[in-house]
């Protein structure tokens, strides 16, 4: 009997089972213990293979692929700390709903807790973050193949969102020629190998029931809050709110067109919050709200009912309103709850939104990050997409810009970390094949710098704008102690990215004004490669501009 041959047959069943649940993209890091999984993936023509030498970046690459494809994406890593590097991407997927299948190779049980090399306690290491966790036994013909495939099917068939951790121990030898070992074991699955359906078919349960009193509530004064959703959902939500005559507060990730732009500015005006107090119901569609003033209003508002609609399970309301948590696909829910044509009930808010936007426009000429955030909609590629980083940049775009309705916007706003942003953007581009504009801060770019290796492989133009404000300037917006702010919060690195781009053979520009930036953008959109554009700005100008605008709009 060949151990290496049966390891590969065991792995082949696992990988083939994944294809029955829509897995097409598979991300692979180098490793020896994962050889059976890697070779099984390589031999399966159903997969599109992606590789990366850094497991943390690999997990985020898979996250980006899953965001766009809306299908589960598999990841293969070897044993040891390689597994732990998947933790950030797994956490993000659990909060934002992407489906990740983590196949982690492991040492067999007799090599755990005895000093063996690269052997750690992997089962359960992700605690409660995976939606499902499977700790497989070592491959053996004593366990029927139908148990293995149905175990995989059960986890994936009931997976609604988040990650699945499948721990796969393999004994040595890991290498060797294939022989007939385990062939009859594998063949007991019969014509399953020629089929395209799961061995065990289950379906996730998704609540989509119509609220019987909707006809009553749609006649009331309502507010629509739009969080993270798809581009198509964003357009439908905008039309739905317009028909109802309800004000729509659209997040940067809502893709609704933000008909009342600069919400995070005008929500700081007492006239706006006073008018919103008249709302009898708030319907929030989508989660992961960005704006600080929006979150403050959301926490303090007290309508008679607060409904949250999202297909992610669990509580999504940190303010714990009295109301309803409706687990449903947003588009499906809108169909079940049609709008009734009514006149808008808000008068003050549209005026404030217009005045806030005019205040922003009046400051758009200076070459700075706040102005870039406002102008970003002018720089979007046609038929393309936008990837927005975290920290200050996403807040500035949320507060100062107005993105087109239905234009795809992606970000990692679940745990809102700055790790893995470039890797996620790479996955977003690969899955879509679209021209992509990505914008991050300098610390975010440094954090995931080796992901520039992933950006060498793009199928359409990708522009990475690095806004270099020399540190974590978001802390300038917080009451951090001034005496320790630079040393312990901002942490300026005093670096530029020209040599990093050159190391990975990427095009690079450092524009000094808007004309140079626009020329660099126009050139970059002409070729299917990655261009790094570093925009060096005064350290605190972005944060100060936002604070000045907040003060100005609050007194309108």
Swiss-Prot record:
GO terms for molecular function: 2-succinyl-5-enolpyruvyl-6-hydroxy-3-cyclohexene-1-carboxylic-acid synthase activity; magnesium ion binding; manganese ion binding; thiamine pyrophosphate binding. This is 2-succinyl-5-enolpyruvyl-6-hydroxy-3-cyclohexene-1-carboxylate synthase. NCBIfam families: menD. Catalyzes the thiamine diphosphate-dependent decarboxylation of 2-oxoglutarate and the subsequent addition of the resulting succinic semialdehyde-thiamine pyrophosphate anion to isochorismate to yield 2-succinyl-5-enolpyruvyl-6-hydroxy-3-cyclohexene-1-carboxylate (SEPHCHC). HAMAP family: MenD. It catalyses: isochorismate + 2-oxoglutarate + H(+) = 5-enolpyruvoyl-6-hydroxy-2-succinyl-cyclohex-3-ene-1-carboxylate + CO2. Belongs to the TPP enzyme family. MenD subfamily. The keyword Magnesium applies. Signal peptide: none annotated. It comes from Shigella sonnei (strain Ss046). Keywords: Magnesium, Manganese, Menaquinone biosynthesis, Metal-binding, Thiamine pyrophosphate, Transferase. It is an enzyme of class 2 (transferase). GO terms for biological process: menaquinone biosynthetic process. The lineage of its organism: Bacteria, Pseudomonadati, Pseudomonadota, Gammaproteobacteria, Enterobacterales. Its EC number is 2.2.1.9. Binds 1 thiamine pyrophosphate per subunit. The keyword Magnesium applies. It comes from the Bacteria.
